[in-house]
Amino acid sequence: MNLGVYVKTKCRICFGGHRYDTSSSDTFAPTVNFCTVLIMICLSAMFSWYLGSVDYSQAYLNAELDEICIMQAPASVREYDETNQEYFWLLKKAIYGHPKSSRLWAACLHRKLIEMGYEQFLTDQCVYGKWKNWDTTNIHGQNVPENMSFVCIPTNPFG
């Protein structure tokens, strides 16, 4: 028995029929830093800005796939041709449960925010800002795995 010796081991577990390979490193998704959330809370308190959250409905379904993805249909809707060969589905967009869907949604949201004139912060890759002057500042922080975004703006958009 070796007392005081720590042995570190790694285990890579993949589920849903997916095998770990080199492309599995693309399954990450960026998350906003907790300190950044605290800074957004402080800014909104100091300047009486509105701080709210945005939940994107069915967000992952808006992201385009970056590779060909074929899926077996669920048992309740499977169809067969005349030679008893099963039909498969060719996916055009990401779906929930796809290993890369959160990363693809993060890339899609990044493109849309840049198109809308936001600039990505250098200190946190999940935070985008848009400002002309101090009264029209708009800060957007994205937290992809939870599919939640934080918005910090000078006025309450709801009145």
Across the structure, where does each feature detected by a protein language model lie?
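Long, low-complexity, charge-biased intrinsically disordered regions
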Residues: 1-159
